[in-house]
Amino acid sequence: MIDYTSFLEQEKEGPLARWVEILPDQISEGLSTKRYGDLEQWLTAMQNLPQVDNVQVSYQSAVTLKSTAPLAQETHTLIEQQFRALIPWRKGPYNIFDIEIDTEWHSDWKWDRVLPHLAPLKHRKILDVGCGNGYHCWRMYGEGASQVIGIDPSPRFVVQFYMLKHFIGSNAPVDLLPVPMEAVPANLQAFDTTFSMGVLYHRRSPMDHLRELKATLRPGGQLVLETLVIEGKLGEVLVPEGRYAMMNNVWFLPSVPTLISWLTKCGFKNARCVDVNQTSTDEQRSTEWMTFQSLSDFLDPNDPTLTAEGHPAPLRAVILAEAPE
């Protein structure tokens, strides 16, 4: 089992104290082998990982782990087998002792689009909502964040994260909690920066999600919001009646002006769009480490500007805004 004891002990006196009181039960529910039938075998894969001394870590495009001494072939093979047991790997890339994990998403490309626009992350306490396996959490730490907490309710992603942290070391102030956004106490106001990337369109009530995000931020803290949008004017929103790009849990795709107005309505200040990008089949695709269908399968085979259902193909915007002082 993943041990959160030191994290809970460290946070019980700080701004997360209210959350720490209820977190043990939330963690137990999020990592329940009764709820998630495959979780036990994923945890076994993590427990099978060997110890590697003197690991060097680079938090660049591919989060890279290297050993100062060559690994024995059987050790290298064992590590690769355990990481493959957690397929599919969606966010990355990673390079684990020369094992290249070519993930479904080139998440480094998104980071390169987002990073230049952010308030500097150095010394910041950061929350990453819906963080997947935590790739961007490591990139945030690499930019000098004092602490990064990711939350994601998928236990596979949580185990993937802690497989990396097994080698990086428990002293790194980066953690991933197996909880959804709803688990975060109201009006926590504990974080300098909160990221929500690839989450808003999965929410039945986008306004509620935006208000929840604002409540995580200290006064003046920065929100980094990345979500699917459509081209259009103020007030225009796509609400797919069926699936969108083969996903049945997509609810609201606003135009950029509409999204900015939502943020303003929810009390954010200075909401502005800093990037709009058409998702390409080079950025999101099937790989050896994610062998299922991907973006090319979700688009109209005769017109890649449309989804298989005839909606506009995925267009992603990055919006920044601040909580009021």
Swiss-Prot record:
Q: Which InterPro entries match?
A: CmoB, Mo5U34_MeTrfas-like, SAM-dependent_MTases_sf
In its UniProt record, a GO molecular function of this protein is:
methyltransferase activity
Please verify whether the record's keywords include Transferase: yes
Binding-site residues, carboxy-S-adenosyl-L-methionine: K91, W105, K110, G130, D152, P153, S154, M181, E182, M197, Y201, R316
Coiled-coil positions: none
Recorded hits in Gene3D superfamilies, A to Z, give: Vaccinia Virus protein VP39
Instruction: Name one process (GO BP) from the record.
Output: tRNA wobble uridine modification
* Reaction catalysis annotation: carboxy-S-adenosyl-L-methionine + 5-hydroxyuridine(34) in tRNA = 5-carboxymethoxyuridine(34) in tRNA + S-adenosyl-L-homocysteine + H(+)
Tell me which EC number(s) this protein carries: 2.5.1.-
Task: Spell out the disulfide connections.
Answer: none
Enzyme class (EC, first level):
transferase
Does this entry carry the keyword tRNA processing? yes
Keywords attached to this entry: Transferase, tRNA processing
Sequence similarity: Belongs to the class I-like SAM-binding methyltransferase superfamily. CmoB family.
Describe its function: Catalyzes carboxymethyl transfer from carboxy-S-adenosyl-L-methionine (Cx-SAM) to 5-hydroxyuridine (ho5U) to form 5-carboxymethoxyuridine (cmo5U) at position 34 in tRNAs.
What do we know about how this protein assembles, alone or with others?
A: Homotetramer.
The protein's matches in HAMAP family, at most eight in alphabetical order, are given as: tRNA_carboxymethyltr_CmoB (MF_01590)
Kindly provide the name given to this protein in its UniProt entry.
tRNA U34 carboxymethyltransferase
